[in-house]
From Swiss-Prot:
Species of provenance: Arthroderma benhamiae (strain ATCC MYA-4681 / CBS 112371) (Trichophyton mentagrophytes)
Name of the encoding gene: sconC
Name of the molecule in the record: E3 ubiquitin ligase complex SCF subunit sconC
A Pfam family the protein falls into: Skp1
Alphabetically ordered keywords of this record: Ubl conjugation pathway
GO biological process: protein ubiquitination; ubiquitin-dependent protein catabolic process
Renumbered residue ranges of the record's region Interaction with the F-box domain of F-box proteins: 106-164
SMART domains given in the database record: Skp1
Length: 164
């Protein structure tokens, strides 16, 4: 429920749990911000059908910490984001979760359109992969190798440039 006095809104997770938060925190999500603009101050809880309670609370924790950050403009320096996998200390600690939760946070950030959180999640995964062999990456993410030795050799030959 939205209240002009406290400026709070309620979100309903996929498992039916209602979470009340500040509107400013919720608006870190472009999806929620657009829904609020479209629906107005109806006072009705906003359903978040693709995100369960535990993930929603984790995303809200991140949004609360970053509520004072300037909003993403969409035309931020894309090149600088692509070139670095540096993550600030608070975000590194925040992302110290099990793999399932990490991937759920990434999916939720994508669904809720929280670009900065999506970037942090993807950089976390990139850092998990950095410097590892394909075998080590498979072990880290529990991925089964379904290539034949011949297919692996062909892929290595085609991608030799990446090994340099």
């Amino acid at each position: 429920m939205a209240s002009t006095a406290t400026n709070k809104i309620t979100l309903t997770s996929s498992d039916g749990v209602e979470v009340t938060i500040e509107r400013q925190v919720a608006e870190r999500s472009i999806l929620i911000k657009n829904m609020l603009e479209d629906l107005g101050d109806s006072g009705e809880p906003i359903p978040i059908p693709n995100v369960n309670e535990s993930v929603l609370k984790k995303v809200i924790e991140w949004c609360e910490h970053h509520k004072g950050d300037p909003p993403s403009t969409g035309d931020d320096d894309v090149d600088s984001r692509r070139k670095t996998t540096d993550i600030d200390e608070w975000d590194q600690k925040f992302m110290q979760v099990d793999q399932e939760m990490l991937f759920e946070i990434i999916l939720a950030a994508n669904y809720l359109d929280i670009k900065a959180l999506l970037d942090v999640g993807c950089k976390t995964v990139a850092n998990m992969i950095k410097g590892k062999s394909p075998e080590e990456i498979r072990k880290t993410f529990n991925i089964q190798n379904d290539f034949t030795p011949e297919e692996e050799d062909q892929i290595r030959r085609e991608n030799e440039w990446a090994e340099e």
